[in-house]
């Protein structure tokens, strides 16, 4: 009987054990992204100097151990970001675009530029992102990259998976925004 109770308690606690917590932010083990089901691949914290900037979780259709697997995974995806300090939309998007440029050559950036401009303009509609703001960058295979801020969609979806892969390279590229964060998003802990 005690063994049965222990097994039941373990089974009930498994979803809680599967969720990840970073800097007080809980990332659920699963997320519905459009019509697709995703699982948390990894989560970590972006830091600049001594400042905690945001907690981030990467959701994929299935777990990926390498950047290549994550970048090439088929189906819905989500980058979930929770700000850990007050940011302006301009600070936030300019830092993302700088990291985007670090992971793409001039020719690739020229091709992506109209989508980068659309993304920047959409991000700027946020205005300020107070601490604990939630930003989702979703890949919806049927429509494109969708930006939501605190649960509300911002702007039109950005067509083309090339742009979403470019966004992923900010954190998973050859020159990631932060090396240890790349490892954490790939499910490695250190």
Regions found by a protein language model. Name each.
Residues 1-4:
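Positively charged n-region of N-terminal signal peptides that target proteins for export
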Residues 149-152:
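Short strand-turn-strand beta-turns centered on an Asx-Gly dipeptide
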Residues 154-181:
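Flexible glycine-rich active-site/ligand-binding loops centered on an Asp-His dyad
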Residues 179-190:
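Cysteine/selenocysteine-centered motifs that mediate thiol-based redox chemistry or coordinate metal-sulfur cofactors
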Residues 19-73:
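N-terminal secretory signal peptides
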Residues 13-15:
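N-terminal signal peptide c-region/cleavage motif recognized by signal peptidases
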Residues 6-10:
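Hydrophobic helical h-region of N-terminal Sec-dependent signal peptides
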Residues 64-142:
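Mid-length scaffold segments of soluble, non-membrane domains
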